UniProtKB/Swiss-Prot annotation:
Belongs to the class-I aminoacyl-tRNA synthetase family. Keywords: Aminoacyl-tRNA synthetase, ATP-binding, Cytoplasm, Ligase, Nucleotide-binding, Protein biosynthesis. HAMAP family: Trp_tRNA_synth_A (MF_00140_A). It comes from Sulfurisphaera tokodaii (strain DSM 16993 / JCM 10545 / NBRC 100140 / 7) (Sulfolobus tokodaii). One of its GO terms (biological process) is tryptophanyl-tRNA aminoacylation. This is Tryptophan--tRNA ligase. One of its GO terms (cellular component) is cytoplasm. One of its GO terms (molecular function) is ATP binding. It is an enzyme of class 6 (ligase). A motif ('HIGH' region) lies at residues 82-90.
């Protein structure tokens, strides 16, 4: 039987079967034993996204935890290809990464790939992608990272420091490997063929194991890294993978910046949020109130419930009650949507305030913070 979904770094199609994806990608499921181990190490409750399997898969997370317990430590790395506007789905890896940084007190490197975005789309100018980089950096800083343990860098600015290690990586990668991994062809520009070397480079910023929290669609990059890292004297990168926050339009695919009806942007005002949720959020309810009261709704396919479950309602007792009431028909689709609208608007209001404050912190994260200063003095070999 043909697989009815497809996941690559560039697109996600169909309703993703995450158990099948683990087998297809050759990753490991995050087991209850692994969760308990994290809990005992941090001596605290797990993040809601870990408790509820939003982060569900990994490579070498067990080795990262062992290194931490043995006193070797580890570091975090994630990134962002800048776009005109960030949406709620873009924040998931950053919010979870902040939690990891807080709990383990480790360095974090955030790569802003203004170069990749420019090279990938023939219509974009470098000025555009650099402006988007600045705007997106404000949203990232607003998440609340430790300014002295976080280095945010743009590829077009930090390239001199990365270039020696990047060319060593590039020399290890063949065109056929890169082409097969990313679906490139003879019409692909040579910049995008070379680019994977730059995305791999930050995994070698320290002589420790690197942990990358990211959507599972980004996994192919790190397979290439894992093939070559040890030959360059570095660790294979470890990963912890997230599921996709479903688009408003239903359980298939993922949110897209280029399709406004699929996403809530971080800049959406309260009225826009309400309009989008009421109009577009896919419902698991019945066609009439009478039928819904009688038969109940299906939270498994209801986007409003899924957003609350994955992100916006961290209280386990409250989410259980919402699920029970929706399944029984006691809670209507419109009422469920209103719960999400209120949570979303509260979140976005707080984010907007933090984003405004972030304007004063850009230089700290990029140039003047403790880790940033140290990184600008380094040439990575």
């Amino acid at each position: 039987m043909a697989q009815d979904f497809n996941v690559t770094p560039w697109e996600v199609k169909g309703k993703v079967d995450y158990d099948k994806l683990i087998v297809q990608f050759g990753t490991q499921k995050i087991t209850s034993e692994l969760k308990e181990k994290i809990k005992s190490i941090i001596n605290d409750e797990l993040h809601v996204m870990l408790r509820r399997d939003v982060f569900f898969s990994h490579r070498d997370l067990d080795l990262v935890l062992k290194d931490y317990q043995d006193g070797k430590g580890f570091f975090l790395y994630t990134g962002r290809a800048p776009s005109l506007g960030m949406h709620i789905g873009h924040l998931i890896p950053f919010i979870f990464t902040k939690w990891l940084q807080d709990k383990f007190n480790v360095n974090l490197y955030i790569e802003i790939t203004d170069d990749e975005k420019f090279m990938r789309n023939p219509e974009y100018t470098l000025d555009q992608t650099r402006q988007w980089a600045y705007d997106n950096i404000l949203d990232i800083i607003a998440v609340g990272f430790n300014p002295d343990k976080t280095f945010i860098f743009q590829d077009t600015e930090y390239i001199r420091n990365m270039y020696p290690i990047a060319i060593k990586i590039a020399k290890k990668l063949t065109f056929s490997e890169v082409r097969a991994t990313f679906g490139l062809d003879t019409s692909s520009n040579i910049g995008i063929i070379w680019y994977p070397a730059l995305q791999i480079a930050p995994t070698m910023f320290e002589k420790r194991r690197c942990l990358i929290p990211a959507g599972i669609d980004q996994d192919p990059y790190w397979r290439l890294q894992r093939d070559i890292a040890e030959s360059l004297g570095y660790y294979k990168a470890a990963q912890i993978h997230s599921k996709f926050l479903p688009p408003l339009t239903g359980p298939e695919g993922k949110m897209s910046s280029s399709q406004p009806e699929t996403a809530i942007y971080l800049t959406d005002d309260p009225k826009t949020v309400e309009r989008k949720i009421m109009k577009y959020a896919f419902s698991g309810g019945q066609p009439t109130i009478e039928l819904h009261r009688k038969y109940g709704g299906n939270p498994d396919i209801d986007v409003s419930f899924q957003w609350l479950y994955m992100f916006f309602e961290p209280d386990d007792n409250k989410i259980k009650k919402i699920e029970e009431d929706y399944r029984s028909g006691a809670l209507l689709t419109g009422e469920l949507k209103q719960i999400l609208i209120e949570k979303l608007n509260d979140f976005l209001e707080e984010h907007r305030q933090k984003r405004e404050e972030a304007k004063k912190l850009v230089n700290v994260f990029k140039y003047d913070g403790e880790l940033a200063r140290e990184m600008w003095r380094k040439i990575h070999e």
